[in-house]
Regions:
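C-terminal, non-catalytic tails of nucleotide-sugar-dependent glycosyltransferases
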Residues: 38-57, 97-105
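Membrane-interface aromatic/basic loop that binds lipid-linked glycans or pyrophosphate carriers
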Residues: 76-137
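Secondary-structure edge/capping motif, primarily at the C-terminal ends of alpha-helices
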Residues: 47-50, 72-78
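Short, charged, amphipathic alpha-helical segments
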Residues: 55-61, 84-89
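Amphipathic alpha-helical repeat scaffolds of TPR domains
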Residues: 59-73
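Nucleotide-sugar-dependent glycosyltransferase catalytic core
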Residues: 6-39, 76, 82
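Noncatalytic linker/hinge segments flanking ATPase motor cores
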Residues: 31, 48-59, 108-116
Length: 137
């Protein structure tokens, strides 16, 4: 956010992107994917310094980032998920902490609410189910 002095929130309900066959979305998890969480934590700190009323909104986005990272971990083979258990634990710990922010959970879509609650409660089951749901085709 550099030297930003103002933050604006818009009502646009979606986004668009180009699916790059060689892009990050198609690559397996590496520890650098944890940077997505760190970047949103840093962005939140900067945004809240400008407008504290956006805490729930920006935290809901951080929660989605945590769940996207957990999804990357879920796509790994079971042996690799075990090798990356520390990152799974970090995601779970951060998720449980962020779910405590008033209003953040309520701003999530129904799908993200379900995913977040399941991953926070039983991460192994969530990762197993996510892995096999994606590979069933």
């Amino acid at each position: 956010l550099g030297y930003a002095r103002k933050v604006s929130e818009i009502d646009y309900p979606g986004y668009g992107y180009y699916q790059n066959a060689k892009g990050a979305m198609n690559r397996p998890f590496t520890p650098s994917y944890m940077d997505q969480i760190t970047c949103w934590e840093l962005a939140r700190d900067r945004i809240l310094a400008i407008d504290s009323a956006l805490e729930a909104k920006v935290t809901s986005i951080l929660i989605m980032g945590i769940m996207l990272t957990a999804g990357k971990l879920a796509m790994l083979p079971a042996a690799d998920r075990r090798k990356n258990a520390q990152y799974i634990q970090i995601c779970r710990d951060k998720l449980k902490q962020e779910l405590q922010v008033s209003g953040a959970y309520e701003l999530l879509s129904g799908g993200y609410r379900l995913k977040a609650k399941l991953f926070a409660a039983v991460p192994g089951l969530y990762l197993y189910g996510y892995h096999f749901r994606k590979y069933k085709d």
